[in-house]
Amino acid sequence: MFDVAIIGAGVIGCSIARELSKYNLNVALIEKENDVGNVTTKANSAIIHAGYDAKPGTLKGKLNAKGNLMFDELCRELEVPFKRVGSLVLAFDDDEMKTLGKLYEQGIQNGVPELYILSKEKVLEMDPNISDNIKGALYAKTGGIIGPWEFTIALAENAVENGVNIFLSNEVVDIEKKDFGYRIITNKDTYDTKYVVNCAGLYADKINNMVSNNKMEIIPRRGQYYLLDKTVGNLVKYVIFQCPSKLGKGVLVTPTVHGNLLIGPDAEDLIDKTALNTTSEGLNFIVEVARRSVKTLPLNMAITNFAGLRARTERDDFIIEEAVDAKGFINVAGIESPGLSSAPAISLYVIDILKNIAKKIEKKENFNPYRRAIPKFIELSEDEKNELVKKDKRFGKIICRCESITEGEIVSAIHRNVGARTVDAVKRRVRAGMGRCQGGFCSPRVIEILARELGVEMTEIEKDHEGSYILTGPTKSEVQ
Amino acid sequence: MKYDLVVVGGGPAGLAAAIEARKNGVERIVLIERDRELGGILQQCIHNGFGLHVFGEQLTGPEYAERFINELNNLKIEYLTNTMVLEINDKKEVYILNQELGFRRIEAKAIILSMGCRERTRGAIGIPGFRPAGIFTAGTAQRFINIEGYMVGKKVVILGSGDIGLIMARRLTLEGAKVLAVVELMPYSTGLTRNIVQCLHDYNIPLFFEHTVIDIKGKNRVEGVTIAKVDNNRVPIRGTEVFYECDTLLLSVGLIPENELSRNAGIEIDARTSGPFVNESMETSIEGIFACGNVVHVHDLVDFVTQEAQRAGRGAARYIKGEAIDNGVVIRTVNGNGIRYIVPQKLRLENLNDEINLFMRVDNIYNNCRLDVKLDGKIIKSFKKRKVTPGEMETVKLKKSDLSTYNDCSLSIEVVKE
Ligand SMILES: Cc1cc2nc3c(=O)[nH]c(=O)nc-3n(C[C@H](O)[C@H](O)[C@H](O)COP(=O)(O)OP(=O)(O)OC[C@H]3O[C@@H](n4cnc5c(N)ncnc54)[C@H](O)[C@@H]3O)c2cc1C
Ligand SMILES: Cc1cc2nc3c(=O)[nH]c(=O)nc-3n(C[C@H](O)[C@H](O)[C@H](O)COP(=O)(O)OP(=O)(O)OC[C@H]3O[C@@H](n4cnc5c(N)ncnc54)[C@H](O)[C@@H]3O)c2cc1C
C-alpha cells in the first residue's frame, strides 16, 4: 500500500516525486513510457522563463517567477546543465513597445526581479546579430536555458535514491475508488494508494475522468522546431522572443544549454494527442517568423526537426487542485508553458495541498539532496581524463564521435537507478547520437553496448518508444 | 611522444599517404585510426569494383584495403587502432585518446589529415513527418548488414541515387528485402552509371528522378513514406503525392567531408568542397598540415583517393626534409562555366614534378562537350568528352610544361558545348 501514487513521470511528476521523497512517505511513480520525461518534457523550448508572460493572479503568474528562482540551487544539487543567459523580447514598432511596457508591469506584479526595457542601440550592442529593424526590447536577466530531459532524469534518479518506487512501462488503464483510497490498474499490475497525484500531461483528462464526474478535456497544441548544429550555436547570446502578435506567438531563436541553436515553436490546436509529426507548413512558418529576429538564419546547418504538444485546457491556466468529488485525488493538469519553469514551485504547491489533506506528514531525516551526474569525459582536464581511463578503460574509447562520448559514459547511463534501456534513452543521458551525424556512426555501437549490458539480443534493442524496433533479424534469415 | 609524421585516419587515403611518405624517406611515422581495424569505409564495402585504375583488376573494398595494409606492415609503419584523434592545432600537436595510452599529446613535424567523410542525415535535408525507427543512412545500414550481420528492414524506399544508395538497393534485394523504389530529387543520378545498371536495372527496381520524400508515417517504426514530384525549383508539386507502404527509409543524400578537427585547428575550408583549400602537394592553409581523400572532397572512385594520397605523402616528405619551395610562381585554379569545384585550388609551379592531375566536378549533365583549360584567359588545352555528369568526378592531366609562365596567374576550366 502506497501513501501517494503519482501518475506520469514527466518533469512535473518527477519534480513532485523528488519533493515527496523528502518526507516519510511510501511513494509510487507510475509511467506508461519506457523512460521518464519522454513526452512533452522532451520536446519543448527548454527555456526557464522569467515570469512576466502570465496574468497576475493566475497560477502561472504565481508559480513561474517563483520556480525560476529555484533553479540555481536545484541544478547545483542535481548537477544539471543550466545557464542564466537572460532573455529579450523584441519590439519592432511603437505598438509593440507598448506591449513591452505591459509585459514589464506584469513581471513586476508577478515578482520578477531584474527586468529592463532597453533601447535598440543597447540591444544591438549586447547582441549584434539581432535584427536592425527593432525599436527596443524587454530584457529579463533571470531568463535561462536548461537540459529538460537531464533535469527530469536527475529528479527521478534523486527521488529513487531517496526511496521513491518507479514503475515504467505501466499504463494506467483504470482507477477504482476504495475505502482506503484508490486502486490503480495498469496494463501490468495494480497499485493501492491513499492519495493520487495526476500528472499525466496530455492524458490528465483521461485519468481525471476515471474518478471524477467533473469532466476535463485537454486540447493538444502542437509546436514545431528546427535544431541547428553547434557551429552556429552562438548566433545569438540570449533567448530571443518576439512580441506576441498575429504572426507568431513566441517563435524564438535561442542557444541551447549544449551549444546548439534552436528555432521555434509555432502553435496549432489539434485533436490527435499523438500527432508529434512535423509538417512543411509548420517548419516554413517558424523559419519565416524567426528571420525577423536575427540578421541571418543559417538554416543549412539544421541537424533535425521535431514537434511537441502542449496540454491546453479551456481554463487557460494550470489546474492544480483536489478533485471536488474525489477526496485525496489531486489534479496537476493543463501544465502547458511555462510548466517546465514552474515545475519546482508546482511541486511545493502540491505538497501544501497534500499536507492539508493528510494532516501530518513528517520530513525525513536522511534525505540526500545530491545527485552526481555522469562525468562528461571530454570536459575533464588532462589529468582527470588520464586518471579516469586508468581506473576504467571504457573511458578511453570514444563511441559517439560528433559529441566525443566514451563507452564509459554510456555504460554508466545504462546502470543508473533509472537507467537507459533504449538508444534514445542513452542519447538523452549522455548525448551519444545527438550530434551532426545524428547517430549514423555510433548507433550500431550503442545498440551493441545496450545488448551486452542488458544481456539481451541486439534485435531486442529499441530506438525509443515501445515498438520502435531497429533491426529485423540476422542477415540471411529471409532467404533460405 | 614525437614523430616526423602523424597520419590521422586509416582509410585508403591515410594508408596510401603513410606508405608513400615512407617510400620518400620519412622515418618516424604513426598512423592513427579510431576504428577497430584499418581500411576505413572500404571494410564495409564488400561489393567489387575497387582498384580498376590502380591495380587493373576488380577488387572488393576489403581486398583493396588489404593490399595497402600488407604494404604498411612490410614497411614497418607504426599504427594505432581504437585510437581517436580529439584535437590538432597549428603547432602541429595531435591529441589522442585510447584505452592503453589514455589522453596523450603527440608532437609532429608534419600531419596528414585523412578522416574521410560522413553522411548527410534526414535533419540536414529537413524531411518533415514522424520520427520513428527505421530511417537509416545508407552507410549505417551497410555497416549493420555487412559488418554486424543484421537486417534493417523488409520493405524499403531509398531516397537519393548516389552510389551508396544504389549499391544498398542491390544488397538489400540480395538479402531478401523488397526495394520498392529509389527516389532522386535531381533530374540525374549522382551515382556512377555502371551502378545504376548493375544495382537497379538488373533487379527491376524503379528509379524516379525529380521526386522526393515529403512525409514519413509511423509513430514507432516507419509505416510508409509519401513521395511527390518536384518542380524546377525542387518544390514538391501538389497532387503528385504517392504513398508507399514500407518499414524502412534509406537515405543516400550526400556525403560531407569530416573537417571538425581541421576547422578547430584554424585550417581554411573551401565552401564549395567543404574540405580544406589545398595546393599541388595537398598542403592546407597551415604549413606542414596536409590532407587527402574524402576529407578534401568526396571521391567516387577509391583509385583517385589513392593517387591524391600519394601526392600528399610525397608533399609531406618533401616538407619534412625541408625541400618544399614556397616562393615562386603560384597558379590559382578557378571554376569556369559548368564547373562546381577544382582541387587543388592552388599550384606552386616549382613544386610540380612533371605533371599534375586536377580533380573536378561539373554542375550538370553535358553531352558532347569540351573541357577548356585556360591559363590567364588563353586556352592551353582542350579535352573532348562524350558525356560529363555531376555524379562522376572528372580529371584533367596537365604537364608542367603546359603551365610555363613567369607570373602568378589563374588557371580556369570550363565546360563548352560542342
Ligand atoms: C512546444 C512547447 C514548448 C514549450 N516550451 C516551454 C519552455 O520553454 N519553458 C517552459 O517552462 N515550458 C515549456 N513548455 C511546457 C513544458 O514542456 C510542459 O509544461 C511540461 O513538459 C509538462 O510536463 P508534464 O510532466 O506535465 O507532462 P509530460 O512530460 O507529458 O508528462 C506526462 C507523463 O504522463 C504519462 N502518462 C500519460 N498517461 C498515462 C497513463 N495512462 N499511465 C501512466 N502514465 C501516463 C506520459 O507518458 C508522460 O510521461 C513547452 C511545451 C511545448 C509543447
Ligand atoms: C558506401 C561506399 C561505397 C563505395 N563504393 C566504391 C566502389 O564501388 N568503387 C570505388 O572505387 N570506390 C567506392 N567508394 C569510394 C571510396 O571507397 C572512398 O572514396 C574511400 O574509401 C575514401 O577514402 P578515405 O581514406 O578518404 O576515407 P575513409 O575510407 O572514410 O577513411 C577515413 C578513416 O579515418 C578515420 N578517422 C576519421 N576521423 C578520425 C579521428 N578523429 N581519429 C582517428 N581516425 C579517424 C575513420 O575511422 C576512417 O577509417 C565507396 C564509398 C562508400 C562510402
UniProtKB/Swiss-Prot annotation, chain A:
What are the binding positions for sn-glycerol 3-phosphate in this chain? Answer: S45, H49, K249, R310, S337
Q: Which GO terms describe its biological process?
A: glycerol catabolic process
Disulfide bond residue pairs? none
Gene3D superfamilies registered for this protein in UniProt: BFD-like [2Fe-2S]-binding domain, D-Amino Acid Oxidase, subunit A, domain 2, FAD/NAD(P)-binding domain
Residues that hold [2Fe-2S] cluster according to the record: C400, C402, C437, C442
Part of which pathway?
Polyol metabolism; glycerol degradation via glycerol kinase pathway; glycerone phosphate from sn-glycerol 3-phosphate (aerobic route): step 1/1
Q: Which reaction does it catalyse?
A: sn-glycerol 3-phosphate + A = dihydroxyacetone phosphate + AH2
Question: Any idea what this protein is called?
Answer: Glycerol 3-phosphate dehydrogenase
What organism is this sequence from?
Caloramator mitchellensis
Q: What are the top taxonomic ranks of the organism?
A: Bacteria, Bacillati, Bacillota, Clostridia, Eubacteriales
| Name of the gene this protein is made from | lhgO_1
